Amino acid sequence: MKQAEKRHFCEPALACALLKATPDKLIGDLETFGFLFEALVERDLKIYAESFGANLYHYQDYNNKEIDAVVELKDGKWCAFEIKLGANQIDKAATELVALRNDIEKNGGIAPSVLCVICGFSNAAYVRPDGVFVVPITALKN
């Protein structure tokens, strides 16, 4: 695993203001919208995690496999989150989370306790047959 800092927006709305991003502009530029959505979710996860003594990190290994957000609990257990704007990205994100968990276990590491895809456009939270949770951003609560 690599160690390096990842910068997070404290308030993604600041980037929107600087970019003069309107809803129409963001819908027309889904790549930027996705980056801003990821920053928004990371901000919220950090706030929720810190409220119960956990920490938020990013994961990337030397094969450039990554996890958008890692929440490490006080007891050392950790949860892996992929953050995706569109529901069409859920299957790929879940498959990558499962593969990364399997690689970590195969190499003798401590696997995440929870795998979760947080999605911007999903109607309900559910658990996939592979055990990956899918949670809409609107379901995140402290």
Where are these regions (language model features)?
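Short beta-strand/turn micro-motifs composed of small residues
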Residues: 60, 117-119
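Short glycine-/polar-rich loops that comprise or flank the Walker A/P-loop
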Residues: 76-77, 110-114
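Active-site ExK catalytic segment of metal-dependent nucleases
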Residues: 79-89
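Active-site-adjacent loop/helix micro-motif of nuclease/hydrolase catalytic cores
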Residues: 87-97, 127
